């Protein structure tokens, strides 16, 4: 390290330590009181509970071939219409499942159970599956980000020892199978990785897919994802870190 840089580092460290010491000796009455874990967990639960069944505002990706195809988000996606878009709704439901699983003592536990029960009805998931079976948009819909988060959701339900989790997982299972089939059909056709810092980035999605393959003990899907990861990334060298960050990163 150059002398100037080292000196600057030592000076910055000294100022930081001194500032902390002054604050310790003269605590300000205006400093916010840190939230504890239960309060933070409750706040995250509240954010998800407020949005999973809030239909608008909303942005949808939906191909329309005629006036008959014009539909509201709730009609298009009966289970995952809230939280502004499909994938945000999915990981909002994952968040609720995760909180109820890991923190059953949360004050919002019953609200979470009721909210998930409202979303994960057989009728709602039949509607979701019908959308994925559309030949025009269903095969590429929410690929890969939303699909990976859906698999993370079902992974959470598998790991949660609660009667409702097992019930919901059974209802979600047909859509899970369809999503696995769509991904499995797509991966061999993917010639290059998607490296941008947005939802389409493949490395992040592959990580969630591998998590799912472990939770579901789906060896064939795991092998396919691992083969794809090696094919697309194994020979990567000299990653241009100087190009980061990008103005389009999410």
Question: Which residues does each PLM region occupy?
Answer:
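Low-complexity, Ser/Thr/Pro/Gly-enriched N-terminal "stalk/linker" regions
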Residues: 26-81
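Extended ligand-binding groove/face enriched in aromatic
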Residues: 75-78, 82, 90, 97-209
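Bacterial N-terminal signal peptides
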Residues: 9-19
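Positions within ordered alpha-helical repeat solenoids
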Residues: 50, 54, 98-101, 156-159, ...
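Loop-centered beta-sheet repeat module
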Residues: 179-249
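Boundary at the C-terminal end of the N-terminal hydrophobic targeting segment
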Residues: 22-24
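Bacterial N-terminal signal peptides that target proteins for export
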Residues: 1-10
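Metallocofactor- and cofactor-centric catalytic cores in central/energy metabolism, strongly enriched
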Residues: 87
């Amino acid at each position: 390290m150059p002398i100037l840089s080292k000196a600057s580092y030592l000076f910055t460290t000294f100022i930081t330590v001194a500032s902390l010491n002054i604050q310790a000796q003269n605590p300000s009455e205006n400093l916010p009181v840190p939230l504890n874990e239960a309060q933070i967990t409750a706040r995250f639960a509240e954010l998800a509970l407020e949005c999973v069944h809030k239909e608008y505002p909303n942005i949808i990706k939906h191909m329309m071939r005629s006036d008959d195809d014009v539909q509201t988000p709730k009609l298009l996606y009966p289970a995952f219409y809230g939280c502004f878009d499909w994938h945000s709704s999915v990981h909002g439901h994952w968040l609720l499942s995760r909180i109820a699983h890991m923190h059953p003592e949360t004050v919002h536990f019953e609200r979470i159970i009721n909210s998930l029960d409202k979303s994960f009805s057989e009728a709602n998931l039949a509607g979701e599956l019908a959308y994925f079976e559309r030949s025009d948009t269903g095969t590429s819909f929410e690929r890969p980000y939303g699909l990976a988060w859906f698999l993370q959701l079902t992974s959470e339900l598998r790991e949660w020892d609660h009667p409702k989790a097992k019930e919901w997982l059974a209802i979600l299972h047909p859509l899970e199978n369809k999503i696995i089939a769509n991904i499995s059909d797509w991966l061999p056709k993917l010639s290059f990785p998607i490296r941008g810092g947005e939802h389409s980035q493949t490395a992040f999605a592959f990580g969630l897919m591998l998590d799912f393959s472990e939770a579901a003990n789906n060896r064939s899907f795991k092998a396919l994802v691992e083969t794809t990861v090696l094919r697309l990334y194994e020979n990567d060298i000299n990653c241009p870190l100087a190009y980061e960050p990008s103005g389009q990163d999410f």
